Structures are given as structure tokens and as C-alpha cells.
Amino acid sequence: MRLPNKYALTFPERRPTPVRPLALEEIRRLDFAEPEFRRFPCLTLALESGRRGGLRPAVFNAANETAVKAFLEGRVRFTAIPRVIDRTLRAWDKTPVQDGRTLASILAADAWGRDAARRMMEKEKP
């Protein structure tokens, strides 16, 4: 994970790294483990949104991007991110429009999610 983390921390630049590129042909075995849902609550929210479908994944993504941006700007704590997403999704679940197969409906859900997440963050303290 060093290389993806480095890319995330130095984006949009690409800085040199002493880490060797991954050579899949050298790996003899890959081990997979159950996700740690308690440790990563946003994973639970993402999977639940995908299972429910409709426009909920678009709202999840919008709330996530908005909350992460606020964290990176120092406006909310890291631990606020899942709370903001969860509260945004709960508010979305109460709206009458839950499905849409057009680009316009997806963009509207995205805008709704961003606006709702911003309102949720007004209640959060950095």
C-alpha cells in the first residue's frame, strides 16, 4: 500500500519513490481476509448503498467526496466522515425520489448529496 498511499498524498504530482513496482509474477500466493467493517465504517455504507441501488450510490459518492474534501481542508475531523455520509444517506432515504436511470437524475442526486453533506457538516466541529 505504500505506492498507492504515496500517489494519494502527493496528487496531482508524481514524485520518485524508492519502492519497487509490484511484480505479480514474483508473488507465490495471495491471501484475502474478511473486511474489518467496524474499523472501516465507510465500507459498510458503500456496500449497503450498492445493494440498495437506485440513486443511493451516487448520493454516497457525493457525500463521501464532500466530507473527505472538508477533512483535507481541516474543516471536520477524520472521524466525522462516516457520520456525515451516514446522516446524508439517512436523509436521502426519506426523499421521494429513489430511482433514476437518466444522467440528469444521477447528476441531481449527486448535487443533492453534496448539498446535504455540507449541511450535515455545519453541525460538525473540526
Q: What is each residue range found by the language model?
A:
Residues 1-126:
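Catalytic, metal-anchored helix/loop core of enzyme active sites in primary metabolism
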